[in-house]
Amino acid sequence: MSKGQAQQQSAFKQLFTEFFNLGGDFSKVSKDLKKPLKTYVKESYPHFLVTDGYFFVQPHFTKEAVAEFHQKFPNVNIVDLHDKVIVINSWSLELRRVNSAEVFTSYANLEARLVVHSFKPNLQERLNPTRYPVNLFRDDEFKTIIQHFRHQALQQSIAKNTKQESLPDISKLSGADAAGKKTKVDGGIVKTGASKGDEFADFSFKEGSTAVLKIQDIFVQEKGKDALKRIQDQQVESVQVQPKVRGGAKGKKKAATKSATKKTVAAKKTAESADVRKSVDKIVKYTPNKPSSRKETPQKSQSAPAAGKSSAKRTTTGSKTKIPANPSPSGKKSTKTTDQMTMAQFKKYLDWHEKKKGGKTSSGGKVLGKRSAGKASATSGKASKASKRSKK
């Protein structure tokens, strides 16, 4: 089934479209469309809305129709027909000018009103709409029909009220401008028909004037004024009550007084300064002492080595020597992970190391420290070599 065929199944759209195409004259509507209408009540209060399964419209009940209904069905209220089926036996269409800002079942300040003269409920029948009905006056195609109707009415008004003699002479106006004469701004504007401000109102259709009852008046007849007042009060309360929102960002707290604000700021500053002092103390505690000069020898360790740790070298007595607390003197540190020493620095290191052990160093930087027993010295070795050469 195509989209156009589905739209043609809407009885309300077909009926109201033909009504506008015929100039808003219900007497010209085809008799085939004036049959009883079986509709489903979408809403019964505060608006009475009926639907054909595709679009909904607002019926308007005459006083005689309401009286007949109450006489034939005394145990059924009109305002309680929600979700029920009604059959509209006698009805008519009227075209009225309204304010579309106030009447939602209208468009471009025009309303095609469904006037109900006789109807009955069909309580045994239940309908299950397959789609959610929408407002007929919000359908794009139907709004185009109404716009076309207004355009035709505007053309008819211009053709009827505009005569050749009443049209302004444009040549005179242009000549006056060329001569430097002053002319009125609205001299070339043609006004036709009656209008209210910028709104066109010169329609040729006969506006309907059938008296109908408001749904609020029908509610009072069936349930009384007190019930109506209670419902209206509930509606007002539901509008005034602000919904509680849960989750999301928390709301802003109320602004505190100036004194409380000052106390809070002072407490924050004190806490921040205390944190800074703690951080500085930790840095000072775990930072090793740096020698003031590169030539200075590191100070002796004043603290005992940690438990389980000792130097790998032992003295002649068997006791372990302590590792200096500070590193040995060296040059500037390189960008690598270890220090690189020059030859001069290495010689200084040897001098320092021998002094630490109690040995002696030569002026050339050679070590002249203690030697173990049983080993010949360098001078004795040289003398023995010289004696061997002389013997030969």
From Swiss-Prot:
<dbReference type="GO" id="GO:0042162">
    <property type="term" value="F:telomeric DNA binding"/>
</dbReference>
<dbReference type="InterPro" id="IPR012340">
    <property type="entry name" value="NA-bd_OB-fold"/>
</dbReference>
<comment type="function">
    <text>May function as protective capping of the single-stranded telomeric overhang. May also participate in telomere length regulation during DNA replication.</text>
</comment>
<dbReference type="InterPro" id="IPR010874">
    <property type="entry name" value="TEBB"/>
</dbReference>
<dbReference type="Pfam" id="PF07404">
    <property type="entry name" value="TEBP_beta"/>
</dbReference>
<keyword id="KW-0539">Nucleus</keyword>
<keyword id="KW-0158">Chromosome</keyword>
<dbReference type="GO" id="GO:0005634">
    <property type="term" value="C:nucleus"/>
</dbReference>
<keyword id="KW-0779">Telomere</keyword>
<feature type="compositionally biased region" description="Polar residues">
    <location>
        <begin position="328"/>
        <end position="343"/>
    </location>
</feature>
<feature type="compositionally biased region" description="Basic and acidic residues">
    <location>
        <begin position="269"/>
        <end position="284"/>
    </location>
</feature>
<feature type="compositionally biased region" description="Basic residues">
    <location>
        <begin position="247"/>
        <end position="256"/>
    </location>
</feature>
<dbReference type="GO" id="GO:0000781">
    <property type="term" value="C:chromosome, telomeric region"/>
</dbReference>
<comment type="subunit">
    <text>Heterodimer of an alpha and a beta subunit.</text>
</comment>
<feature type="compositionally biased region" description="Low complexity">
    <location>
        <begin position="257"/>
        <end position="268"/>
    </location>
</feature>
<feature type="region of interest" description="Disordered">
    <location>
        <begin position="234"/>
        <end position="392"/>
    </location>
</feature>
<keyword id="KW-0238">DNA-binding</keyword>
<dbReference type="InterPro" id="IPR023113">
    <property type="entry name" value="TEBP_beta_dom_sf"/>
</dbReference>
<feature type="compositionally biased region" description="Low complexity">
    <location>
        <begin position="374"/>
        <end position="384"/>
    </location>
</feature>
<protein>
    <recommendedName>
        <fullName>Telomere-binding protein subunit beta</fullName>
    </recommendedName>
</protein>
